[in-house]
């Protein structure tokens, strides 16, 4: 075991997806897993195999899509969960099962209704069963932050003897202070020694997840569990980008500790998560917020122009955020287009290149100046493919009196051309009602967001919708177009197609 390396365990695909409205389909999960491999994380928690057939399928597909990263499935300390986890990761080159049980008095008494001895027995049995599927087994003491240290040591001893290779101590409800997390981790590091890796998993309910994770590292934890953009249920999880950049930027404090993160993939990873989930980092978010490297104060601007380090402790280029220069136009050829995509980290087959180049030429005809962010959105739209049950052929709309509007749409469905129109309270409402009429499937819009992808009056609009259909969880749809209304229709159609694909 390398005592200087910090193992980065990313749980965006599992814990991050539990953030309200952040559900991802299988294609999106696979694309994100591929990006996390490029980012250089060591372990990805690809999902909770027993939760649903969709989760199981996504984990299986991720195992086939990555080759360098360790793929992990979460499982409760229940035999059927562990069996599902083991079967879902069996094709992975590197695999892990992560099993857990609550150890705090309040959880054992009210949730599990088990005695401490019974909890230990369940932990032992689950770890031994998990070891029949793979050698690498992680055990978590759920709600360790509110557990008694003496009991944590007792169950950890039993877990290691049963075969656990990593011991995770989560602050499940984000309750602990850095000094308290440091004490707990320090005690377990001394207790466990070299017998297992000690891991931290912090939540941000009191805004201290990153500070707590840093404290855990300083106390001896050698695995950190985190998510891109700090995505997660309630107030979120430890933000991966913040911790790894702290280790890099403050090497004077952390050396010789290090991670294997490819820092130049941080920004792209952040944008991909934001695009897929529709959850944008707040503008002043550390590292990846749009204002993270912006300076408005005249004094600050003057200082940065004279020497960047006067007010910048790291460079935007360090995280892969290059100057958003004009890169291509309608006269650009396929070779220049391919070279630019390669520089942005995309390697396409000839068929993929031909398909996306055709879309690029259409965009270039509508938009004079093409920026890096335009290409990133175009590629995300191309790589995260959803079967198209419905496709937009044409859209027209008109404003009526007193805020009312009408929309007319022509859609293609199974080689059949369908047309209809509807009135609504504004054009957006009219578009959605028309799609509902044509498809025969009614959706309930829960959220609607629109933003400009890049700069300029002809910037593409990126529309994200969150829709509830019959017997579905929230479905996310994205639309990209220089026409905001067309982007709106594409986003709703995208959500509809995802819903139909999930049902099938």
Swiss-Prot record:
Tell me the compartments it is located in. Cytoplasm
Keyword annotations of the record: Amino-acid biosynthesis, Branched-chain amino acid biosynthesis, Cytoplasm, Leucine biosynthesis, Manganese, Metal-binding, Transferase
Q: Which reaction does it catalyse?
A: 3-methyl-2-oxobutanoate + acetyl-CoA + H2O = (2S)-2-isopropylmalate + CoA + H(+)
Keyword Transferase listed? The answer is yes
Per the database record, which ranges form the Pyruvate carboxyltransferase domain?
6-267
Obligatory cofactor(s): Mn(2+)
Q: What class of enzyme is it?
A: transferase
Q: Which GO terms describe its molecular function?
A: 2-isopropylmalate synthase activity; acetyl-CoA C-acetyltransferase activity; manganese ion binding
Question: Could you tell me which residues belong to the region Regulatory domain?
Answer: 391-504
- GO BP terms in the entry: L-leucine biosynthetic process
Give the superkingdom in one word. Answer: Bacteria
Q: Which residues bind Mn(2+)?
A: 15, 201, 203, 237
The UniProt subunit note reads as follows: Homodimer.
**Full protein name:** 2-isopropylmalate synthase
> From which organism does this entry originate?
Campylobacter hominis (strain ATCC BAA-381 / DSM 21671 / CCUG 45161 / LMG 19568 / NCTC 13146 / CH001A)
Identify the gene encoding this protein: leuA
